[in-house]
Amino acid sequence: MEKIKIIVASDSIGETAELVARAGISQFNPKQCKNELLRYPYIESFEDVDEVIQVAKDTNAIIVYTLIKPEMKQYMSEKVAEFQLKSVDIMGPLMDLLSASVEEKPYNEPGIVHRLDDAYFKKIDAIEFAVKYDDGKDPKGLPKADIVLLGISRTSKTPLSQYLAHKSYKVMNVPIVPEVTPPDGLYDIDPKKCIALKISEEKLNRIRKERLKQLGLGDTARYATEARIQEELNYFEEIVSEIGCPVIDVSQKAIEETANDIIHYIEQNKSK
């Protein structure tokens, strides 16, 4: 089956349209709904809209758009109707309803939700921090972090760091590997901001075997053997015991659920 092409078009960064598109895609079997997102942010002219229309015509793409300026929105609407293209106006119907409800015209300013206020800068800083200090790259990040995640391989440290960063938490993650001594600074920071991520031996074994298959390798590699996994788990327990930090079992939890548990713990202990 050919990939479904979706054009995300916006007169701002396009984050809202992309989130809605991805939310819709997530409701379908990925094997049956293979997709490709094409991004067209900062649309400012009719020529920009024409480019989107041409690509949609050439690729039979669905256009998902958030255009705030009335003239841009109207032009897009006319063009998709003219060429009978598949499209979804994310913001238009909602803004029309709100305008009618409050009997007031909207600002019609693209990107107003992303005004560069303190909260926005804090979020960007947190995202950059998570990238810079991913996988224990630099121990200098330890005292600067709001949260330090510890765990062996395949315990979702990186996606959790990114998820929490989007909640404006500066997160550093540190891999726990028997052959690598944890950074000295790990024992100097407040253990209340450390979270250890635990996973069951059975779940980890399945994940690692699947990972090896994806890499085209046999599932008998030492990386996925029970002996190696048990060695890593034992070492993990030893390090966590020395630090004295809380442990969250991620074996049966989604990223969002684990992140919420972490946030709850961190916020509870801020004032203690």
UniProtKB/Swiss-Prot annotation:
Its EC number is 2.7.11.32, 2.7.4.27. It catalyses: N(tele)-phospho-L-histidyl/L-threonyl-[pyruvate, phosphate dikinase] + ADP = N(tele)-phospho-L-histidyl/O-phospho-L-threonyl-[pyruvate, phosphate dikinase] + AMP + H(+); N(tele)-phospho-L-histidyl/O-phospho-L-threonyl-[pyruvate, phosphate dikinase] + phosphate + H(+) = N(tele)-phospho-L-histidyl/L-threonyl-[pyruvate, phosphate dikinase] + diphosphate. Keywords: Kinase, Nucleotide-binding, Serine/threonine-protein kinase, Transferase. GO terms for molecular function: ADP binding; ATP binding; phosphotransferase activity, phosphate group as acceptor; protein serine/threonine kinase activity. The keyword Hydrolase does not apply. ADP binds at residues 151-158. Pfam families: Kinase-PPPase. The keyword Cell wall biogenesis/degradation does not apply. It is an enzyme of class 2 (transferase). NCBIfam families: PRK05339.1. Bifunctional serine/threonine kinase and phosphorylase involved in the regulation of the pyruvate, phosphate dikinase (PPDK) by catalyzing its phosphorylation/dephosphorylation. Belongs to the pyruvate, phosphate/water dikinase regulatory protein family. PDRP subfamily. This is Putative pyruvate, phosphate dikinase regulatory protein. It comes from Staphylococcus aureus (strain JH9).
